[in-house]
From Swiss-Prot:
Keywords: Ribonucleoprotein, Ribosomal protein. This is Large ribosomal subunit protein bL32. It comes from Desulfovibrio desulfuricans (strain ATCC 27774 / DSM 6949 / MB). Belongs to the bacterial ribosomal protein bL32 family. It holds the Pfam family Ribosomal_L32p. GO terms for cellular component: large ribosomal subunit. One of its GO terms (biological process) is translation. One of its GO terms (molecular function) is structural constituent of ribosome. The gene is rpmF. It comes from the Bacteria. The keyword Glycosyltransferase does not apply. NCBIfam families: rpmF_bact (TIGR01031). Disulfide bonds: none annotated.
Length: 60
């Protein structure tokens, strides 16, 4: 296992970690008006690209 030769400064550590942040997920609004993730089936109505993909029951 590799061992560092010199201590990394707080500045160098911060520069290395500057790209480690968590990305905020993109949100779009379905034709039913509910927010959903792009390229995924809408969890509330079950449509994808304007087509009914998942049959939703009314007893929910």
């Amino acid at each position: 296992m590799a061992v560092q030769q010199n201590k990394k400064s707080r500045s160098r550590k911060g520069m290395r970690r500057s790209h480690d942040r968590v990305a905020i997920p993109a949100v779009i609004y379905c034709s039913c008006g509910e927010p959903t993730v792009p390229h995924c089936v809408c969890p509330s109505c079950g449509t994808y690209k304007g087509r009914q993909v998942v049959a939703k029951s009314d007893n929910e």
